Amino acid sequence: MTYQHQYLDGTRIHFPLGKVVCVGRNYAEHAKELNNPVPTEPLLFIKPGSCVVPLDDSFSIPAERGAVHYEAEIAVLIGKPLSKTPDAEEVLDAISGFAPALDLTLRELQDQLKAKSYPWEVAKSFDGACVLAAFVPGDAVEDLSDIGIRLSLNGEVRQDGNSRDMLNPILPLIQHICGHFSLQPGDVI
């Protein structure tokens, strides 16, 4: 199955699928839930584009590899190159869209890797580990500090969050990321 960025109306977004920059423990409540310390700066890791699948297709959860943890996330699609330390206006101008995403983790494998002080990307980067819905155009979102995200499973709400609860808000977070490496059109935060 081939993934292609698209807007809610079905219009294809002609950016190549790039990297997926993820932020671990960006919500204090989630860090506490996992008995992890709340980080003092963004905890960044990257998923390869090969792990992305569209939400509208069926996707498989590799239960044979152990417990699979899921988290609803707010995905931000980058539409213009960003590097070094862009100002907030440049970052806002480079945002092409927002979408709900599902971040899947092989939790048992991640715990084993962490216990050995090994990198744990393989527990978060398997094929299908990043499920992306269609994007809402960036300029359609008026308040980046009030984007809701909810995950229900069989009618039961499992997660109900909002961007206002982020330890690192969207624009400063993207600025921080650009201080470490460039973002290109098609990259997803």
Label the model's feature ranges.
Residues M1-S96, A101, E108:
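Extended, compositionally biased flexible segments
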